Each structure stands twice: as structure tokens, then as C-alpha cells.
């Protein structure tokens, strides 16, 4: 019996060491979240233990849509696709007000997926936090494509009655206002959002997007190549169509024609006069 305990003791310690951090991370993350909403949908508990409440704007502002329920959402856990399949939109700007009593470091996590439009420049809008524009011209399809999860992560700091976000500072009176601002292209929207204490490093990352990573790598390669590639493309450029005729050459020919005609008439006339 003693030998079994001697073996199981260290084994249990190893298991707790390996499993412990994962269990603690899940429960710890949920404890850090102070406010979460499934916009346009019902309450939901995600794989991290975050409890999203039913949309408090239901019947008050904007419209709820579950159009995305018929589509699978890339980059999202299968259990949490509902967070990207429902949404709230409005024909004008709208938002959520979140009371915050304690000072400290916070993170706003906004969840989106484009489930309707299939090209860029169809739905574009801004996002403001207490009047500060934190996301400009958000085009979800342009960022990640169709029916694909996209998160906007916005760190903020509240200290000594001041809100700091992206280098801007304003007076904070205990209420955080997250606003989705109407633009020129369609209506602003959001699928889900939550506020948590901590930093951006504490936010769970979405699953990899192979197409998006390839696009970013190509953009980085183009930036590294710089001007030589542009020079080469200019060098290999083919002219489209024939050269444009010189307008001044045509003007000279048109001026010479009357002179030649006059000269041709003058010579025979002079010859006839001489014979007389």
C-alpha cells in the first residue's frame, strides 16, 4: 500500500500541475468579465465560461437578426457560433451603456461576422467609446471575408476619474458608452460584446484564418520589396493603343494647303497676261 501511495502521490501532483492552469484560466477569465451581451440573441455561456446575457436593447433600439443562423461561422468554436450568427443593427447610430465602478485596466471585446453582404464597401461604420473613435471605417467583409468571425479588441484605462483609450483622455463619470456609428454604407451592427478587467493579452484568440494569414504575408512581402517592384512593373508596362497624333503637325499641313493652291492659280494667270 505504501508503494502505491508513493507512486500515485507524485503522479497526482503532475496531473494537477498540467491540468490546473487550464482549468484556472477558464474560470479565471469568466471571473474577469463584468458585462457581456449576445446582441440580437438569447443568453449563452461560451467555452471559456463567459455568460452572455440576452440583449437588453430588445424592443427598444434597432432590430435583431438571426439571418446568420443558416451559416457556419469560420474561426469560431462550434459551440460559440451563435455569438456571431445573431446580431443587432440599426438604421442610425446606436450603442450600449455599461456602468463601471472600479478603476483599473479593462478590455472591450466586440464580435462581428458579415453574413449578408458578399463584397467590400457594402457595410462600413465607425465605433466610438465615450466619444473617442476607436475603430474607423470598419468593413467586416474587407477584413476577413464572408461568414467569418472577427473580433475588435480595445484596451482602455480608468484612473483618477479619467478614461484613456488609444492615446486620448477624457473625463470618466462611471459609465462606459460603446457606440456603433452610422456611415455612408448600410447600417452599423454588432454580434456580441463583453467588458473584462485585464489586458489584451488576456483575451482568447480566434482560430487561425489561413486565407487571412496568406494575405498578410503577401502584403508584408510587398512592403519589403518596396520601390524596386514598382519600377519593374512600370518597366514591363505595355502601352494600350497607338500613339496620339501630333496636333501641331496637322495644323502645319492645313496651313500649307491654301498657299499651294494660291500659288498654282497665280502662275497660269501670270503666263496668260505675259502673252497679251
Swiss-Prot record:
Gene responsible for this protein: mlec-b
Record's subcellular location: Endoplasmic reticulum membrane
Lumenal face residues: 27-253
Record-level GO cellular component terms: endoplasmic reticulum; endoplasmic reticulum membrane; membrane
Main location: endoplasmic reticulum
Function, in words: Carbohydrate-binding protein with a strong ligand preference for Glc2-N-glycan. May play a role in the early steps of protein N-glycosylation. Can bind di- or higher oligomers but not monomers of glucose, including maltose, maltotriose, maltotetraose, maltoheptaose, nigerose, kojibose, cellobiose and isomaltose, although based on their subcellular locations, these are unlikely to all be physiological ligands.
S-S bonds: none
Entry protein name: Malectin-B
Bias type Acidic residues, positions: 216-226
Annotated region described as Disordered, given as residue ranges: 202-249
Keywords: Carbohydrate metabolism, Endoplasmic reticulum, Glycoprotein, Membrane, Signal, Transmembrane, Transmembrane helix
Signal found in the keyword field: yes
UniProt key word Aminoacyl-tRNA synthetase: no
Glycosylation-annotated residues: 252
Residue spans of biased composition, Polar residues class: 229-249
Transmembrane segments: 254-274
Residues annotated as signal peptide: 1-26
Binding site for a carbohydrate: 67, 89, 116-117, 186
Alphabetized Pfam families for the sequence: Malectin (PF11721)
Coiled coil: none
